[in-house]
Amino acid sequence: MANPAHISAVRTLYKKILVLHRFLPIDLRALGDQYVKDEFRRHKTSSDEEAKHFMVEWQNYKDTLQTQVLEAMGNKKLVFGADLSEDKLKHFQDEQIGQLYELMLESTKPNRQFDIQEEGTPK
């Protein structure tokens, strides 16, 4: 599935996700950006079927995040994330469950490991 149209669609989706991450709190943005980069890199050599599923799921993520960003801009209230249904979790591989668990732990830490500040913010 390495045709030019597919490659263009992957790049466009990747860039849109990174743009949406700019609206996340800085520590979650750093975590999300790194995860997206790793996942897209990891799936460069996937089969056609895996690539199709990968694109559908990341498109769903982009759509959900875009909706949440637009709602947050209107309400000035930052609420990001979504619950996964049991049905979706049943389709995950063990490695994916482990990754999801690690992401959940990292993103819900009260004192997150990232000590990142917005540009122009004094230390």
UniProtKB/Swiss-Prot annotation:
GO terms for biological process: mitochondrial respiratory chain complex II assembly; succinate metabolic process. The keyword Ligase does not apply. It is found in: Mitochondrion matrix. Pfam families: Complex1_LYR_2 (PF13233). GO terms for cellular component: mitochondrial intermembrane space; mitochondrial matrix. Transmembrane segments: none annotated. Coiled coil: none annotated. Residues 1-31 form a transit peptide. Keywords: Chaperone, Mitochondrion, Transit peptide. Interacts with sdhb within an sdha-sdhb subcomplex. Belongs to the complex I LYR family. SDHAF3 subfamily. Plays an essential role in the assembly of succinate dehydrogenase (SDH), an enzyme complex (also referred to as respiratory complex II) that is a component of both the tricarboxylic acid (TCA) cycle and the mitochondrial electron transport chain, and which couples the oxidation of succinate to fumarate with the reduction of ubiquinone (coenzyme Q) to ubiquinol. Promotes maturation of the iron-sulfur protein subunit sdhb of the SDH catalytic dimer, protecting it from the deleterious effects of oxidants. May act together with SDHAF1. PANTHER family: DC11 ACN9 HOMOLOG (PTHR13137), SUCCINATE DEHYDROGENASE ASSEMBLY FACTOR 3, MITOCHONDRIAL (PTHR13137:SF6). This is Succinate dehydrogenase assembly factor 3, mitochondrial. The gene is sdhaf3.
